[in-house]
């Protein structure tokens, strides 16, 4: 959520900025009307509250003197219903204004390139050289079919489209990847390993920005009278650990890592990536989350992105680093780097990690604060999140980049300790 003072004091300027850099239309006239009505109701409510307080004081004084207070009580009763109705109306219009504010995306940092979509993203760097094959290569679907490793047919019987059953050595490789990533981030990068719930309440989703805007992307379940949601990323659970908290300065930065199942409806994906495991309803990720002081978030963003890059480098997977433009960034982000891994079968780089600095956008929604040791006052923290990395896509990249002419897969050296020393599968 943006700073409310921007909506109250710089509405026209904010609307112009959102339109230019985010392609987001803010209804200025409607917001001005709401704000004007809020002020009117608030003034009326305060006047009635002041009148009630003065009458209550007069009643107390009269009673202490033994005087009859029936007329004063009648006066209070006469406007009490009006006061109650005014308080309800004020709360309703505040809720309406908050609903509008919750639907406004974050503003980008000044160094984020202006653009409409992914075509305007800016490549920052490349690592590794794509392998040249001396045989006809297969994609991960064909490689999986050769050995019965990837079973979409059984998954469809169990759950429907966009699910896959992993069998045998490839399931083991998938597990090895997740364990290796988590060990790297915990042992070498200083993240605390956290095991989090994958079913969360609506408050958690409002906190990180998935609700109210992206409800159609979420899987949900009804538990009695309460609706719960399956997480689309463990960023949700990890970040909300600091919701409504005041963190002492010496505890920052907080760095947390989690390996979890994730669930997405892919409502807006249309017919993209229907073949194979690129875009699934259920997948796994190792997620990184940092909570820090505002002045440290840019450095923390660079550090987090570098931690994700290290995963791809230790696996020997060629990748490129992309700075997303204003029109391609996520709703809550103020700056985002994507890492894209090379897939030989497609002859292109595909996203495998997204690392975002959200500034104080999520913190304001969650009321996540730190105590400034100089002023002694609580201030909003900055939150960051990044994939470190998507496990299924890493498995696909390993399968394709490490394939052999006979359809076997060479196991990257860093994974062999997790696979009892196996150097090849298939």
From Swiss-Prot:
It is an enzyme of class 6 (ligase). Catalyzes the attachment of serine to tRNA(Ser). Is also able to aminoacylate tRNA(Sec) with serine, to form the misacylated tRNA L-seryl-tRNA(Sec), which will be further converted into selenocysteinyl-tRNA(Sec). It catalyses: tRNA(Ser) + L-serine + ATP = L-seryl-tRNA(Ser) + AMP + diphosphate + H(+); tRNA(Sec) + L-serine + ATP = L-seryl-tRNA(Sec) + AMP + diphosphate + H(+). Belongs to the class-II aminoacyl-tRNA synthetase family. Type-1 seryl-tRNA synthetase subfamily. InterPro entries: aa-tRNA-synt_IIb, aa-tRNA-synth_II, aa-tRNA-synth_II/BPL/LPL, Ser-tRNA-ligase_type_1, Ser-tRNA-synth_1_N, SerRS_1_N_sf, SerRS_core, tRNA-bd_arm. Its EC number is 6.1.1.11. It is found in: Cytoplasm. This is Serine--tRNA ligase. Pathway: Aminoacyl-tRNA biosynthesis; selenocysteinyl-tRNA(Sec) biosynthesis; L-seryl-tRNA(Sec) from L-serine and tRNA(Sec): step 1/1. Keywords: Aminoacyl-tRNA synthetase, ATP-binding, Cytoplasm, Ligase, Nucleotide-binding, Protein biosynthesis. It comes from the Bacteria. It holds the Pfam family Seryl_tRNA_N. ATP binds at residues 264-266, 351-354.
